[in-house]
């Protein structure tokens, strides 16, 4: 069956998922496609494994930005697609292939239907980690092309195709990775009194961490600590000398993130004293909350409702993490959910976005950009 140009682009990208700052094939694919759009008013830069494209407007007064994340996840794909990932153990399980395709489609429209204002497209690596938005924002490559307004999207499996969802103000949570290493003294299982058991210490720590949420965070201000991985020990009859916890912290407010981390550190100090061990905390990557500019978001929602065939709804905050929050901290703009009607959710090995969304998104975003970027 013949598919449209942009559906084929999405499938091409889906085959080559790459993890953060290793998106070399993806970068080259984007550059090759941009090369087919060559015009004297199009400028291209690379930044690490990302791509920055500027379409110079006819009579610019501002720069409008669109950000698309381009990286995949370390997940083994189970979609059954004919165009499934060719990279073992990697998959576009968060829809970044769709985000990138929509960006290339919007870029194509921008070249053929040039507007007054400048447009900058940020094809950003490493959203899934360690985080590409903040260093890209601070890069020399973007300094002269820094947008005055910026928008981004994320696919939403739970919403129907043709629906977008967003809200003014806080949309996504503050998030932080959490790694805790415990080191004690190993020994024979028959002589526990001669050792410091780090499996037991880690177990106590996991349960105590949950009290941070129930007893140290305002019930009206959501927060979550998830320990997703525990490792420790070697065999069944040796008391573990080491153990490791890996997880995430998510809070709706910056203040709660600070409070949660402070309490974690206090609890860890207690574990060290109780079990006579050494505990090291590493917070890893932290993503700033996604906070939509109220006026721009309201204006965008009204435009979509009145001038496009898309359905726009107001959603609630999500505990999702997104490094686009760093861009919105410095640049007025917004992010929205884009419905893709998938039975399986984000980060699932069977995620299958409905490809009908691609043309719809390119069309309505192009309408918005022309409305926003042309003199009235």
Curated annotation (Swiss-Prot):
It catalyses: N-acetyl-(2S,6S)-2,6-diaminopimelate + H2O = (2S,6S)-2,6-diaminopimelate + acetate. The keyword Manganese does not apply. One of its GO terms (biological process) is diaminopimelate biosynthetic process. Its EC number is 3.5.1.47. It is an enzyme of class 3 (hydrolase). Keywords: Amino-acid biosynthesis, Diaminopimelate biosynthesis, Hydrolase, Lysine biosynthesis. The active site is at 69, 128 (proton acceptor). GO terms for molecular function: N-acetyldiaminopimelate deacetylase activity. Pathway: Amino-acid biosynthesis; L-lysine biosynthesis via DAP pathway; LL-2,6-diaminopimelate from (S)-tetrahydrodipicolinate (acetylase route): step 3/3. Catalyzes the conversion of N-acetyl-diaminopimelate to diaminopimelate and acetate. Belongs to the peptidase M20A family. N-acetyldiaminopimelate deacetylase subfamily. This is N-acetyldiaminopimelate deacetylase.
């Amino acid at each position: 069956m013949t598919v449209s140009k942009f559906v084929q682009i999405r499938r091409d990208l889906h085959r080559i998922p790459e993890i953060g700052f290793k998106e070399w094939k993806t970068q080259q694919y984007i550059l090759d496609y941009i090369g087919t759009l060559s015009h004297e008013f199009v400028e291209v830069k690379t930044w690490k494994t990302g791509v920055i494209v500027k379409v110079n407007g006819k009579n610019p007064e501002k720069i409008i930005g669109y950000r698309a994340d381009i990286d995949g996840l370390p997940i083994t794909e189970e979609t059954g697609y004919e165009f499934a990932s060719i990279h073992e153990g990697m998959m576009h399980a968060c829809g970044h292939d769709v985000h990138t395709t929509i960006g290339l489609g919007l870029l194509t429209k921008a070249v053929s239907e040039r507007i007054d204002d400048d447009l900058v497209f940020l094809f950003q690596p490493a959203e899934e980690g360690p985080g590409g938005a903040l260093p890209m924002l601070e890069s020399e490559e973007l300094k002269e092309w820094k947008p005055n307004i910026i928008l981004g999207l994320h696919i939403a499996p739970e919403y129907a195709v043709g629906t977008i969802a967003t809200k003014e103000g806080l949309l996504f949570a503050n998030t932080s990775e959490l790694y805790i290493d415990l080191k004690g003294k190993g020994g024979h299982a028959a002589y526990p009194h001669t050792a410091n058991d780090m499996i037991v210490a880690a177990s106590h720590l996991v349960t105590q961490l949950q009290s941070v949420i129930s007893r140290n965070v305002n019930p009206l201000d959501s927060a979550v600590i998830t320990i997703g991985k525990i490792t420790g020990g070697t065999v069944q009859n040796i008391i573990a000398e080491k153990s490791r916890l890996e997880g995430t912290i998510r809070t709706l407010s910056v203040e709660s993130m600070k409070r949660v981390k402070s309490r974690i550190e206090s609890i860890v100090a207690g574990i060290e004293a109780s079990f006579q061990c050494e505990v090291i905390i590493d917070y890893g990557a932290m993503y700033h909350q996604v906070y939509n500019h109220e006026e721009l978001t309201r204006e965008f929602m009204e435009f979509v409702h009145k001038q496009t065939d898309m359905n726009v709804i107001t959603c609630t905050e999500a505990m999702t993490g997104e490094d686009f929050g760093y861009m919105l901290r410095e640049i007025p703009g917004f992010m929205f959910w884009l419905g893709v009607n998938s039975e399986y959710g984000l980060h699932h090995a069977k995620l299958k976005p409905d490809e009908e969304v691609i043309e719809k998104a390119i069309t309505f975003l192009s309408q918005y950009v022309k409305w926003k970027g042309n003199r009235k």
